[in-house]
From Swiss-Prot:
Major place of residence: endoplasmic reticulum
Annotated Cupin type-2 domain residues: 222-288
Example GO biological process: ureide catabolic process
Location of this chain's protein in the cell: Endoplasmic reticulum
Chain residues that bind Mn(2+): E235, H237, H241, Q275
Protein name from the UniProt record: (S)-ureidoglycine aminohydrolase
Primary gene name: UGLYAH
Functional note: Involved in the catabolism of purine nucleotides. Can use (S)-2-ureidoglycine as substrate, but not allantoate. The sequential activity of AAH, UGLYAH and UAH allows a complete purine breakdown without the intermediate generation of urea.
Length: 298
């Protein structure tokens, strides 16, 4: 009889342990419990810096830099005051030092902050990841940009970005490559207002934030993947890429390397590096992608 009581006690204890968060049968969820209550792109600005089992390794980082690509993860971002901006910290993530012809950086605007102007002949695109800013141009007209909004500023276009509280922007800049008499224009928009474009042979959802006319020498894409979806084409091309993963997680192939990636990660892709992505987890993956277009590579 005592043996029977002992067996029953052990079984009940195991069942309770398996149902508790501390039980040996439990496993952490890959989905945050408050995921649905947080604003869009929250995870990109509040990333998981390292898995719990690696928190005792102070020197651990997922960041990698190679000749033809780089993975720059949030624990590696180094912020300092942005030149010509007020009350703003920036982290330069991709620059010509890597071989790129463009710059990509994060700008963390604090209370009562404002932007500076880029150098002469430099075009700029800003995308709001967190908070809100006000864009003002030379005619004193202003537009409020909130999360998921963006603005393209042509070269030598006088403007100011002002922030009353706080905001996080991802900024792309490059020296404009003039083509005949073609000129670009100020563009203000939001991702949800852009149409879905056809992607023959692919399953992801594609939006382009800039016009596809020859005046524009780069474009910014958003690409959405549901869990389990992946690129069909294993891309190898002359275009350069700068990428910010806004949502989700997955595996990115760069060359012969396969990297686990998550929201908040930045990737630099040089020309002709083999590249491929597959979405994992339980939520949508969305990334923001820079791509040079409409110019002869010669």
């Amino acid at each position: 009889m005592r043996s029977l009581y002992l067996i029953v006690f052990i079984v009940i204890s195991l069942v309770k342990a398996s149902k508790s968060d501390d039980g040996f049968c439990s496993a952490p969820s890959i989905v945050e419990s408050d995921e649905k209550t947080n604003p869009i792109y929250w995870k990109a600005t509040n990333p998981t810096l390292s898995p719990s089992h690696l928190q005792d390794l102070p020197g651990f980082t997922r960041s990698v830099y190679k000749r033809d690509h780089a993975l720059i993860t949030p624990e590696s971002h180094v912020y300092s005051p942005l030149p010509d901006w007020t009350n703003t910290l920036g982290a330069y993530l991709i620059t010509p030092a890597t071989g790129s012809h463009f710059v990509m950086y994060l700008a963390k605007m604090k209370e009562m902050s404002s932007s500076g102007l880029p150098p002469q002949d430099i075009e700029r695109l800003i995308f709001v990841v967190e908070g809100a800013v006000t864009l003002t141009n030379t005619s004193s007209s202003s537009k409020k940009l909130t999360v998921d909004s963006y603005a393209y500023l042509p070269p030598n276009f006088h403007h100011s970005l002002d922030c009353v509280e706080s905001a996080t922007l991802v900024v792309f800049e490059r020296r404009y490559e003039y083509l005949g008499s073609h000129t670009t224009e100020l563009i203000v928009g939001s991702t949800d207002k852009q149409p879905l474009l056809e992607t023959p042979g692919e399953v992801f959802e594609l939006r382009k934030l800039l016009p596809m006319s020859v005046a524009y020498d780069f474009n910014i894409h958003t690409m959405d993947f549901q869990p389990g979806e992946f690129l069909n084409v294993k891309e190898v091309h002359y275009n350069q890429h700068g990428l910010l993963l806004l949502e989700g997680q997955g595996i990115y192939r760069l060359g012969d390397n396969w990297y686990p990636v998550q929201a908040g990660d930045v990737i630099w892709m040089a020309p002709f590096v083999p590249q491929w992505y597959a979405a994992l987890g339980k939520t949508r993956s969305r990334y923001l992608l820079y791509k040079d277009v409409n110019r002869n590579p010669l």
